[in-house]
Amino acid sequence: MTETEFLALVDQVLDSIESQADDWAAGLDVDIEATRSGNVLTLVFEDGTQVVVNVQAAMQELWVAARSGGFHYRYDGQHWNDTRGGPRLPDALSQICSEAAGVPVSVRL
């Protein structure tokens, strides 16, 4: 995948996550603020918990920073897979954000 293709893909991913966070705020009454600055999306929850999704274009990865740790994801053409064998990106973000929100939320990509 070229860098241009990768950047277009991750732009869609970040837009999707940001939109879903807005939906949680409206539909589930989750107190969350989603802020995007270039290739970095920061989700801040009511208790101050931050989840940061960051694009690493040179490595063609998405990185997630959360209280539970740092995670790296690489796209295989269909899925964003954890480079260390953990859950895929949507499942991991769903779990991380559900814990921070205090209610079940689901990330779909």
Curated annotation (Swiss-Prot):
Keyword Metal-binding: yes
Origin superkingdom: Bacteria
A Pfam family annotated for this UniProt entry: Frataxin_Cyay
GO cellular component: a single term: cytoplasm
Transmembrane segments: none
Family matches, as Gene3D superfamilies: Frataxin/CyaY
Role played: Involved in iron-sulfur (Fe-S) cluster assembly. May act as a regulator of Fe-S biogenesis.
HAMAP family, alphabetized: CyaY
Protein family membership: Belongs to the frataxin family.
UniProt protein name: Iron-sulfur cluster assembly protein CyaY
Origin species: Bordetella pertussis (strain Tohama I / ATCC BAA-589 / NCTC 13251)
